[in-house]
Design a protein with these regions (language model features):
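C-terminal, active-site-flanking charged/polar segments
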Residues: 45-48, 53-65, 503-507, 584-587
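Conserved, short, structured surface segments that act as functional micro-motifs
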Residues: 39-40, 49, 65-81, 224
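Ligand-binding clefts of soluble mixed alpha/beta catalytic domains
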Residues: 74-604
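Acidic, low-complexity mobile loops and tails
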Residues: 1-27
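Short hydrophobic beta/alpha edge segments that flank linear recognition/processing sites
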Residues: 18-39, 57-72
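Generic structural motif
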Residues: 2-9, 40-51, 57
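Methionine-biased hydrophobic packing positions in alpha-helices, especially
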Residues: 5, 32-34, 496
Length: 604
């Protein structure tokens, strides 16, 4: 019998005169701190031991001599009992126990407190969001960096996962398939040091964000928490060398990112939420770049957390995209939002398109709800509006056409008559970037008298903000279709049509469409001012003015525009959906992407 590995002879398992069988261990050899069993290749009687314990052996060196004439022909059974698949070894039991103490079941008081406030735990939110059984957790055994202050047993009990539950999962896989359903989830745990960002959970976050960047994995983040954790132990000075915020920002435009906010979300937690494509917040949310302690420390006054950035402030100012009742609804909306970026759905219902003929009033000065047009034009119950209370004159929504995701921008004539103000331009421009980044075609429903003018408008930096729509549209690569519902005047109409009536893949109008370089009343007063002033009789002057305006309206009718080929067609409103579907069918499919199309999606 020869050695099969170089090393030191540790022990003999047989002695001269013993009978051995093939496969029986005859000696132990140690190499590189590991023990190797030397097995007999055949049976027989041991005649001599050829090495002493402690000797260093070379590979293939003879160890003992066997007389094969005494081989009984039986293989060695190993002397092992049948394995019990349910037996838990002590080393595994320790690991199992460490994992168990991170679960909600091991923390009944913390869970009960959370539930008493009408809130879910971090693990409950993730469990409800992801597909059943799909979640694998990274860094579950992490502990807070407070080892000089707290004993390990205390850290295990008080800082499970260091306050950040994170890992990989799928969402909506049954609908879109596992590849499209890939998702990274990260949830700050408010029951652990108020969801603050500790040294170790920063490292965990950085690890996962780097993985999301490498493998292009969409991210959903529950951002509730108080920002940095000042009582953690850090061997450096500032902790400003962490990569967390850079890591999340690098995902912008590469993969969809969603922040869900509930309760208090301040400082670093809020900064991460602000880097995401969309913020979904519950009605109990307060969201700000600093909490009360930091505000007071800066000498800026004393406030309660709920006074800093409540939903009543952060929804109309555009910070929050979607407001929901509670965390359960937030999960459902996040699942739905992710679906628009995962693909088409097979089940859809088209509303009765004939209703579109009656949604824009015959009286041209009567306002209407453009959201009713959106609900009727696109698949039934498929719309999800973003930032509805911010810049309400500009509607931005995700919807579907025969199951295919599309983005919708639309003027709402109930607000400023559909005029585009600075906030509305920002809202539309950012939404264009979002849709283009992820290959979602855009549909523009135009009904605008132009952009907002006047000294008050200029105080909002309209010149710069309004121009964002031109810049964003000029960089689009996705299909862009325009339907003019009624008004299409001046630069506002050009902004809604990607810079020009001829820029979109098609520009069509409903019969109610009216067009001009500016509002006709103003154009007549500007162009015929001297002629009108020369008419002494006020009644005659008004009649001449009204006649000039009527002629301008006649020239600006949609039919006349189409006759001059400034429109692709004037269509029956009931035919709009067919136009959009045929337009989409005529466009090439976007090429598979290995990286991002756009440098990033603007935070604003």
């Amino acid at each position: 019998v020869r050695t099969g590995v170089p090393g030191s002879l540790v022990a003999w398992r047989v002695q001269p005169g013993d009978t051995v069988r093939a496969g029986q261990c005859v000696a132990l050899v140690e190499a590189m701190k590991m023990e190797f069993e030397i097995l007999a290749e055949q049976g027989g009687r041991v005649e001599a031991l050829l090495a002493e314990v402690g000797h260093v052996l070379v590979d293939g060196q003879p160890l003992l001599a066997l007389d094969p004439r005494h081989d009984d022909g039986q293989a060695h059974d190993g002397g092992q009992q049948a394995l019990d698949p349910d037996h838990i070894r002590p080393d595994l039991a320790e690991v199992v126990q460490r994992h168990l103490v991170t679960q909600d079941a091991a923390r009944p008081e913390a869970v009960a407190k959370r539930h008493a406030q009408g809130q879910l735990t971090a693990r409950e939110n993730i469990e409800r969001f992801v597909d059943a059984g799909s979640f694998i957790e990274y860094g579950a055994l992490a502990l807070a960096s407070q080892r000089t202050r707290l004993k390990e047993a205390e850290l295990i009990a008080r800082s499970p996962a260091d306050g950040l539950v994170a890992g990989l999962a799928t969402v909506n896989a049954a609908q879109f398939g596992e590849q499209a359903a890939r998702c990274m989830v990260m949830a700050y745990d408010y029951t652990v040091f108020a969801g603050t960002q500790g040294v170790i959970n920063h490292q965990k976050t950085d690890r996962l964000l780097h993985l999301a960047l490498q493998r292009q994995i969409p991210l959903v983040l529950w951002a509730e928490g108080g920002g940095g954790r000042p009582n953690d132990e850090y061997p450096g000075v500032s902790l400003l060398d962490n990569m967390t915020f850079l890591g999340l920002a690098r995902l912008s435009g590469l993969v969809p990112t969603v922040a869900i906010v509930n309760g208090r979300c301040f400082a670093g937690n809020a900064a991460l939420a602000g880097c995401c494509d969309v913020i979904i917040a519950t009605q109990s949310t307060t969201l700000g770049m600093a909490g009360p302690a930091m505000i007071e420390g800066g000498g800026l006054g004393r406030f309660t957390p709920e006074e800093v950035g409540p939903v009543s402030m952060q929804e109309p100012n555009g910070v929050i995209d979607i407001v929901v009742k509670d965390e359960a609804e937030a999960v459902a909306v996040a699942q739905r939002y992710m679906g628009y970026f995962q693909g088409r759905i097979a089940d859809w219902v088209a509303p009765d398109q004939r209703l579109l003929r009656h949604l824009v009033p015959e009286k041209r000065t009567q306002v209407y709800d453009v959201r009713a047009v959106i609900r009727t034009l696109f698949d039934e119950a498929s719309g999800l509006e973003l930032r509805p209370r911010f810049a309400s004159g500009m509607v931005t929504a995700l919807a579907r056409l025969e199951g295919r995701p599309v983005g919708v921008i639309a003027n709402d004539p109930r607000h400023l008559g559909g005029a585009i103000d600075a906030d509305g331009a920002d809202k539309a421009a950012r939404f264009m970037q979002l849709c283009d980044a992820f290959d979602i075609p855009l549909v523009s429903l135009c009904d605008t008298p132009g952009f907002m003018v006047g000294p008050e408008a200029e105080k909002t930096a309209t010149v710069r903000h309004f121009s964002r729509m031109f810049l964003a549209a000029a960089s689009l690569t996705v299909p862009y279709f325009v339907v003019v519902l009624r008004k299409g005047y001046g630069l506002g109409a050009q902004a809604m049509t990607a810079g020009s009536l001829l820029a979109p893949d098609f520009t069509v109008s409903w019969p109610t469409g009216e067009f001009g370089p500016m509002g006709f009343e103003g154009a007549v007063r500007l162009g015929f001012g001297k002629q009108l002033e020369a008419i002494a009789d006020p009644l005659q002057r008004q009649q001449v003015f009204e006649g000039l305006v009527a002629e301008a309206y006649r020239r600006g009718k949609a039919l006349n525009m189409a006759a001059h080929l400034e429109l692709d067609d004037v269509i029956d409103p009931a035919d709009t959906r067919r136009w959009l579907l045929r337009g989409l069918a005529s466009m090439p499919q976007p090429a598979p992407r290995q990286g991002r199309k756009r440098p990033f999606v603007d935070a604003w």
